[in-house]
Amino acid sequence: MAIERTLSIIKPDAVAKNVIGQIYSRFEKAGLKIIAAKMCHLSKPQAEKFYAVHKDRPFYPDLVKFMTQGPVMIQVLEGENAIVKNREIMGATNPKEALPGTIRADFADSIDANAVHGSDGPETAKEEIAFFFKPDEIF
């Protein structure tokens, strides 16, 4: 089993619901360690750059607008198979399809306001972590 790191973002909808602590508890119960964290309000250029992979998709403008509407909580998670484990905890992108007990089933309102983001693979995780954190900010 490999120790991995992954990026997690608690999106503006979940921050506004005051469920950061409940989400952190789920990470920890799954054996994921929070090794870096910060709260910030993404600027439009930051959100556009972070989600640039989706720039040709029809939902891109709404995604950028949503991600800049309020503060987000960004963290690096570390643990055995952290990427897959985090994605399992998050649940399906569409909360209506998410399994009961997942973050999205419990806290998300819609496919757009879906509470959390998580890296989808090892290379993406490295890029996303570097986007938000300098090496000396990760413990």
Swiss-Prot record:
The protein's required cofactor(s) are namely:
Mg(2+)
SMART domains from the UniProt entry:
NDK (SM00562)
- Keyword set includes Phosphoprotein: yes
Keyword Zinc present in the record's keywords: the answer is no
Which EC numbers characterise this protein's activity in its record? 2.7.4.6
Chain residues that bind ATP: 11, 59, 87, 93, 104, 114
Top-level taxon: Bacteria
Provide the GO biological process annotations. Answer: CTP biosynthetic process; GTP biosynthetic process; UTP biosynthetic process
Active site location: 117 (pros-phosphohistidine intermediate)
The record's annotation in InterPro entries points to: NDK-like_dom, NDK-like_dom_sf, Nucleoside_diP_kinase, Nucleoside_diP_kinase_AS
**Reactions the enzyme catalyzes:** a 2'-deoxyribonucleoside 5'-diphosphate + ATP = a 2'-deoxyribonucleoside 5'-triphosphate + ADP; a ribonucleoside 5'-diphosphate + ATP = a ribonucleoside 5'-triphosphate + ADP
UniProt keyword terms in alphabetical order: ATP-binding, Cytoplasm, Kinase, Magnesium, Metal-binding, Nucleotide metabolism, Nucleotide-binding, Phosphoprotein, Transferase
For this protein, the record's PROSITE patterns field holds:
NDPK (PS00469), NDPK_LIKE (PS51374)
Q: Where in the cell is it found?
A: Cytoplasm
Pfam families named in the record: NDK
What's a single GO CC term here? cytoplasm
Q: Which GO terms describe its molecular function?
A: ATP binding; metal ion binding; nucleoside diphosphate kinase activity
Where does the UniProt annotation place the signal sequence?
none
Database matches in Gene3D superfamilies? Nucleoside diphosphate kinase-like domain (3.30.70.141)
The entry describes its oligomerization and partners as: Homotetramer.
Give a short account of what the protein does: Major role in the synthesis of nucleoside triphosphates other than ATP. The ATP gamma phosphate is transferred to the NDP beta phosphate via a ping-pong mechanism, using a phosphorylated active-site intermediate.
Give the protein family.
Answer: Belongs to the NDK family.
Query: What PANTHER family has UniProt attached to this entry?
Result: NUCLEOSIDE DIPHOSPHATE KINASE
Q: What is the protein's given name?
A: Nucleoside diphosphate kinase
Please name the source species: Coxiella burnetii (strain Dugway 5J108-111)
